[in-house]
Amino acid sequence: QYMEDNGQDHLSQFMKVSEQILSAVMEGDAVRTAQQIQCVHNDFVSSIEYNDENSLACTIMIALISAFRYYHRPIREFPCGKGFADIVYQPLASQPNRPVIVVELKWDKGAAAAIAQIKNRQYPVSLQEYSGEILLVGIDYDKKTKQHTCLIERFTNFACQ
């Protein structure tokens, strides 16, 4: 765990955790992603502000800080399709084989509702300049159980010719 004092600096330890979270997202491992997001949320967010979308969005950006190696800075409330995606990661020009990552956050509605919103509001349409894969990531926080759930789907976007 990155908060333990084992002789390494905390930043290096956390960057390893962040790489593991990014790997879980890339591999489509929703269970592992949710578990790790929950740990970061618990460690970095005050219990006073815990049940709020901004706190969860900031948690995601902290958890995926290692993505800066491969992606532009995350864009909050990215205008796309018929609405605004909560967070979008666009790959750097030097990383053309990396997928775009679209993250939608929900409270007490289930991760499937987040994925449905991405599809129903046609968020991927605004990302059609990317001819590769788009990862749709839905993350939900259940206030009663205090559990995070995640659903990850792959979407292939074919750029207009």
Residue ranges: model-predicted function:
Residues I139-Q147:
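Short, conserved secondary-structure transition motifs
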Residues Q1-A114, N120-Q122, E133, Q147-Q161:
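Extended alpha-helical interface modules used as scaffolds for assembling large macromolecular complexes
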Residues A67, L127-Q128:
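Generic hydrophobic alpha-helical segments
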